[in-house]
A protein has these predicted regions:
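Single conserved hydrophobic/aromatic residue that forms the stacking wall/gate
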Residues: 270-273, 277-281
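A well-structured
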Residues: 1-272
Length: 281
């Protein structure tokens, strides 16, 4: 049975014409969006057709970016040291910073549209995307200046994005020492994690403690990466005006704090009941 992932449904390879053509299409789309954004914010009137065009451009660009990113990320999920995957990951990150100023301008323009409900009601396209438009308006209060947004986006490539790649690389290449049938073996972390579902209780126990012990090999590197990411999050949260990183996460997750508290309380009750059952057994 074939156990390797097939990504040919997305692209045949990084060197394929399909992948290269979409990269070129991305460059053209970015250039076009940047030019169009300047025209939109400088010219008054025609709000409804402009907003419809924004939806059209945003949808097409998101679909294109999603396809490219999926191929890169899935390739690296299977092989974190894939040189082509790493190279194109950096290339994509760099390209995407080029649209930040334009998208910031457009989102701020949308947030300043007067009588937005009337504008939306006059278009079937806009009515279909009302939630998306209203969310842009709601989140606009956290926007920084066009230039600041661009700077943050570019610095993330050598900040949190780089730290995240380091953390993923350390974890994905981690080997776990575990005793199986009286023999010590060195296995990939993913293999040991899958042992959590093995019907043999003793093997599950060994796998758990072996996993925890293995993290000591990379704990300093992972801690440094997480601290770097956390530091950036704290800084950006403060700049944008969020009350805390949790507040930012709740906003981005479309969740209120009361819902989160209810979920956490339910989890605590469940784990408490489960622990009581284990003790009874």
């Amino acid at each position: 049975m074939e156990l390797n992932w097939s990504l040919k449904e997305i692209y045949p390879s990084f060197e394929s014409e399909e992948f290269k053509n979409d990269l070129e299409k991305l460059d053209q789309s970015i250039k076009s969006l940047n030019t169009w954004a300047d025209e939109v914010v400088c010219e008054e009137g025609n709000v409804r057709p402009k907003l419809e065009e924004y939806i059209k451009r945003s949808s097409k660009l998101s679909e294109l970016i999603g396809r490219l990113e999926a191929f890169v990320s899935l390739t690296l999920s299977a092989d974190t040291k894939n040189s082509e995957g790493l190279r194109y990951s950096d290339i994509l990150d760099s390209k995407l910073t080029e649209i930040v100023e334009a998208t910031t301008k457009l989102e701020r323009w949308i947030s300043n549209i007067k009588d937005i409900d009337t504008v939306i009601k006059g278009s079937e396209v806009l009515k279909e995307h009302e939630f998306y438009i209203k969310e842009i308006i709601e989140k606009s209060k956290y926007l920084l200046s066009d230039r600041e947004e661009s700077i943050i986006s570019k610095m993330k490539n050598t900040g949190s994005n780089a730290w995240l790649k380091l953390k993923d690389n350390l974890i994905s290449n981690l080997k776990v020492d575990i005793e199986i049938d009286g023999e010590m073996k060195e296995l990939p972390l993913t293999v040991v994690l899958n042992m959590a579902y093995d019907p043999n209780g003793e093997l599950r126990r060994k796998a758990y403690f072996a996993e925890i012990e293995s993290y000591k090999k990379v704990e300093e590197g992972v801690a440094a990466a997480l601290n770097g990411i956390k530091g950036e999050v704290l800084t950006v949260c403060d700049l944008r005006g969020y009350k805390s990183p949790l507040d930012m996460t709740l906003v981005n997750s479309r969740m209120d704090e009361e819902s989160l508290d209810a979920m956490l309380e339910a989890c605590l009750l469940y784990t408490s009941d489960a622990a009581d059952e284990v003790q009874l057994v």
